[in-house]
Amino acid sequence: YMDMNYYYSYYTDFIGYKVGAKFNTLQDDTLTGAYEIALPSIQAYRMAANAENTVTTQGASIGINYYIHSNYSINGNYSWNKLNLKGTDDPIIPAYNTPENKFNLSLTGRDLHFSNTNKLFRDFSFSINYKWVEEFMFEGSPQFTGIVPTYDIIDIQISKNISEINANIKIGATNLFNNNHFEVYGGPYIGRMIYSSLLFDIE
């Protein structure tokens, strides 16, 4: 099946921020009437403010789930998001912090039995997911504003249901191939993470 949607949002007095700086100056006695900036005394400010012009956002998304078999499915989704600032002279910094394009594609399998007699090879599930995010401008505080580069990662997970003890064991990895990247400007690099869990269902 398929899901599709589109949105268009219209804002007045959109809240963003402006950046300013305060400079303390010292008079230079060697030059009459001249001043120099005292570098240690520069103070930057980030203040919330309303947009002077109309701001609109629009976007669309599509999601697809296709069942190859009762046990297997292919899933995918794509989203497009766009910020429009009408009036190029508006000094506001919108801090939209959203990539224009991104998508996910995954393959999942459920209740898989690789043997009819050996319980060790029964009741398996898995998922493989690919994620792609386009580069975008991240606008935070003055020192944390810049481009977040395009990145892509693969996540995997395998689980087995153990019906005899009402338990499920799971092992997986996010960012399987250790594609070091950051998702916010100024944030830490994110690498591979491997995890496991054992869940008991107590009735």
Task: Briefly describe each language-model feature range.
Residues 52, 95, 99, 145-146, ...:
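Residue-level "hotspot" positions that anchor or transmit function at local structural transition points
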Residues 131-140, 147-149, 153, 158-203:
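C-terminal beta-signal and adjacent terminal beta-strands/loops
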